[in-house]
């Protein structure tokens, strides 16, 4: 039996990107800075966590050596393992963006070598012509926001006005994205999804990567809270990905969390929705039980990025990493001979960095399973090597990008 389990710790970068300066991210290091804050006691939070960052299972998969290779530094305060199991290394990104689709598509063997469209103006981000077209086609009275913003902050600032006026909150960031926040009951979840579908069509000519529905509940600024009904409306990848090649070869792709949305549901045979890292891990373990020979189980663990990276919450990010690490043995116990599990990330989002955006970083590669020997695979020149390694392991034809390290 040969199966593959690909787990993306969304935004868990390890620093060291050779082109970080071009993105204003020279020195950004998600793992390194979290560990530094933890070692200094700056990520202690009563009832949540305290002390140095404790990731014993990932360290046994080579995380400290990965960090040393990628950025030149061993994370502060972390305990080295007695020995390293499995394949370990890191990868640089060749895609031009530092966003979720770019990272995931490159992981699956399709780097984004073209330029995304963006909304670079921080105020009045969307043109009057675009706003007018959205309002007319979606039959809405107008929009709120129209700026670069943090999602939680703009909901706090405009949520009550949104409820009163019926106008959705529209905003963007340095990524190629158009985000729409609306109340699940006052505006309606189905109406929000329909609005996003309308906006998606209008933005296709502008080459905007994603339209994201951001539903929330609550009646006042003190009670507003995002729900788990987020939806991403992505443009499809520009060429077949690992997922497409697997499906064409008669294999199944179990897409957990937002994986289906990221690939515009291309190359996906089964979509499994779950909300929160714990539920995503539960869903992953259940999918492993059901996966057949040749299948791929593919999960995005979004909380690292959405709840802690963008919100610059170091303690929250550290606690989430420790909780994830504690469950890695559950994956080990589910694995059969011939299986491989691979942990990686799609970009960085250093919670100690300025602003609220992603950071350009290398990502870790930690691969393990029965029969997988410990080996340093070095610094890979593209995330695409990850997808090609899975393709090789599952015995399908190689793609056009990347090189297997298996």
Swiss-Prot record:
Keyword Transmembrane helix: no
Binding sites annotated in the UniProt record for Mn(2+) 2: 305, 310, 358
Intracellular or extracellular location(s): Cytoplasm
Cofactor note: Binds 2 manganese ions.
Gene Ontology biological-process annotations: 2-deoxyribose 1-phosphate catabolic process; 5-phosphoribose 1-diphosphate biosynthetic process; metabolic compound salvage; nucleotide metabolic process
InterPro entries: Alkaline_phosphatase_core_sf, DeoB, Metalloenzyme, Phosphopentomutase_DeoB_cap_sf
Cofactor(s), names only, from the UniProt record: Mn(2+)
Coiled coil: none
Family: Belongs to the phosphopentomutase family.
Described purpose of this protein according to its UniProt entry: Isomerase that catalyzes the conversion of deoxy-ribose 1-phosphate (dRib-1-P) and ribose 1-phosphate (Rib-1-P) to deoxy-ribose 5-phosphate (dRib-5-P) and ribose 5-phosphate (Rib-5-P), respectively.
Protein name as catalogued: Phosphopentomutase
Organism: Agrobacterium fabrum (strain C58 / ATCC 33970)
